[in-house]
């Protein structure tokens, strides 16, 4: 029987190779983590986020069965289904990922995972579980997996590229020369995301780099990885859920004000984080992205400070009507309605006056209105697709803030 113990390896800041930093063991559904002695004695060691550098089992935050910084390195729905299909032989994505343990996902997922951690069977020998694959192979593997078709041996390497990253839709990691990408495969949502990223950048949002490309007669969205430097250097990275000591079960309790508090107290630039976060919320509302849950926010961790990552996974998915809510509340009293007027009323939370907040919102709305045609062209959207998005983004509801009093 395979031991329910795995060793955690980490890439320290600036390091090109990993070192063992600790061990994780599963006992009755709870995962205990201990730093290794060699890591604690290493003068260059940095703490994993949320786990102080000290001997003994690190206590789990209330309600959690696995430290968030370790959970962030595991696959989400798509990657779990890929692993489930490989291990069980069942086709399609109808299986229940809960059939397999977190330890299994640690062991079976690719080493090219989110952030700068990996899981290994050995504390002394590191075995890289990531192979190269072409974009065409990745696309074909994703298509076959969605259909439930068996994969030929020639696509087995491509298969693994979908096992190490988060998200529910088909995607895979890709390396092109010295650059590292996440490939998102052909679907309407992929083009919608390209349009939203294009517009968000013109709103003044720091977004991930991205490009639309073609393979096998289909479009693929390539999103530049912010947890990798050019050449492959890895950055420790944590999700919003981890920053808030939450997991998926309790993710509904995540709020922007709580995230703001963490980034203010632990961030590298506390003076401007309120303004930056407010602009991102405004952009999400304008762009119809109501899927702004805590795992769709991240920060880079250097052992001392957090730095908000570029914005990613911006998806215009809100229904075109008025009654919509953001996944995370933006007000300290639970306000989450997808209206700009409601957001502006919460300006003091982000250390902004009403006038400053309204100016930011106006800039976001103007960016959409001024760049709509070029965004459609950039995202290669058809007339019918553009019409549907127009009802979501250029919706009368996004102008409601213009009737709010500017008295701040």
What spans do the regions from the language model cover?
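Phosphate/dinucleotide-binding and metal-coordinating scaffold of catalytic cores
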Residues: 1-294, 298-408
């Amino acid at each position: 029987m395979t031991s329910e113990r795995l060793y955690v390896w980490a890439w320290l800041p600036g390091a090109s190779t990993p070192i063992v930093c600790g061990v994780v063991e599963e006992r009755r559904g709870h995962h205990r983590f201990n730093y290794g002695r060699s890591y604690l004695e290493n003068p260059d060691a940095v703490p994993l986020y949320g786990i102080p550098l000290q001997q003994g089992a690190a206590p789990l935050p209330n309600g959690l069965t696995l430290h968030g910084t370790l959970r962030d390195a595991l696959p989400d729905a798509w990657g779990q289904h890929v692993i489930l299909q490989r291990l069980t032989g069942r086709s399609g994505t109808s299986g229940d990922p809960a059939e397999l343990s977190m330890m299994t996902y640690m062991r079976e997922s690719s080493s090219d995972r989110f952030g700068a951690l990996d899981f290994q069977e050995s504390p002394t020998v590191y075995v890289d579980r990531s192979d190269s694959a072409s974009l065409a192979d990745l696309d074909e593997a994703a298509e076959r997996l969605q259909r439930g078709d068996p994969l030929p041996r020639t696509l087995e390497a491509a298969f693994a590229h979908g096992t190490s990253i988060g998200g529910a839709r088909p995607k895979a990691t890709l390396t092109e020369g010295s650059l590292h990408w996440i490939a998102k495969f052909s679907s309407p949502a992929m083009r919608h995301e390209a349009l939203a990223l294009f517009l968000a950048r013109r709103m003044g949002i720091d977004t991930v780099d991205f490009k639309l490309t073609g393979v096998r007669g289909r479009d693929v969205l390539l999103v530049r990885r912010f947890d990798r430097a050019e050449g492959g250097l890895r950055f420790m990275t944590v999700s919003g859920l981890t920053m808030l000591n939450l997991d998926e079960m309790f993710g509904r309790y995540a709020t922007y004000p709580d995230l703001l508090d963490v980034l203010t107290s632990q961030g590298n630039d506390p003076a401007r984080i309120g303004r930056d976060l407010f602009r991102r919320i405004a952009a999400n509302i304008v762009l119809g992205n109501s899927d702004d849950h805590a795992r769709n926010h991240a920060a880079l961790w250097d052992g001392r400070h957090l730095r908000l990552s570029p914005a990613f996974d911006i998806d215009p998915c809100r229904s075109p009507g008025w009654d919509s809510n953001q996944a995370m509340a933006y007000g300290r009293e639970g306000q989450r309605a997808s209206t700009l007027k409601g957001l502006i009323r919460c300006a003091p939370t982000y250390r902004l006056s009403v006038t400053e907040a309204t100016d930011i919102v106006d800039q976001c709305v103007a960016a959409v209105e001024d760049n709509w045609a070029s965004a459609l062209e950039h995202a290669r959207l058809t007339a019918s697709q553009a019409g549907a998005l127009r009802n979501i983004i250029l919706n009368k509801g996004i102008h409601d803030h213009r009737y709010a009093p500017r008295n701040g």
